[in-house]
Amino acid sequence: VYQSYWLEVRNPGGHSSLPTKDNAIYRLAEGLTRLSKFDFPLQLNETTRTYFERMAALERGQMALDMKAVTQPQPDAGAVARLSAIPRYNAQLRTTCVATRVEAGHADNALPQTARAMVNCRVLPGESVDAVRQTIIRALADDRISVTPVEDAKPSVPSPLNPQILRAVEKLTGEFWPGTLVIPTMSTGASDGLFLRNAGIP
């Protein structure tokens, strides 16, 4: 689920010839630094769990072991950390939020009265968007940084891995490309699947 938030700090401001320690830009930057060091918890759904289980069969060595490990009831922390260091796998393992824009101040010689940053999140299907907002607030650890959704989210549950459909895909794949493994994957980008699922079409 695609969801963006404005993070904003307001301040009385002033003139740069009389600087103060309480600076909207500094406060926002410190909050963003804390957010950058925060990871949402590991959360696999049916699709991502199957993805890592089947990808493990194609990988070798430590990568194969790590992919198997993250699908276990008690995932190995080292395996989670190693996969999380790879952006394409990290985005499959958890909800992600990242700062993408910053705006502040109005003049070279004026202390900023506002500083704000756009944070874009990719919320795992089935996870509460409001819960993600509350998690961001806790990660920022500063009640002077407001967190406001840019627009209402369009939540969606994950697409089910329908065994009947999957078997048909595997059968045809086997006929045309013998030995090819079918691996379901969850896109971290937006797709029309969101609207189809909400219309009752899996």
Q: Locations of the language-model features?
A:
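Hydrophobic, small-residue-rich alpha-helical packing segments that form membrane-like cores
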Residues: 1-3
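Predominant activation on well-ordered alpha-helical scaffold segments within soluble catalytic domains
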Residues: 6, 26-33, 96, 170
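A generic structural motif
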Residues: 11-17, 106, 121-128
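A short core secondary-structure module
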Residues: 12, 16-42
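Short amphipathic alpha-helices in soluble, non-transmembrane regions
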Residues: 22, 31, 132-140
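A common structural junction motif
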Residues: 35-39, 137-145
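An extended, acidic, His-containing surface patch that forms the Zn2+-binding/catalytic region
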Residues: 46-106, 113, 130-134, 146-202
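C-terminal catalytic subdomain
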Residues: 110-132
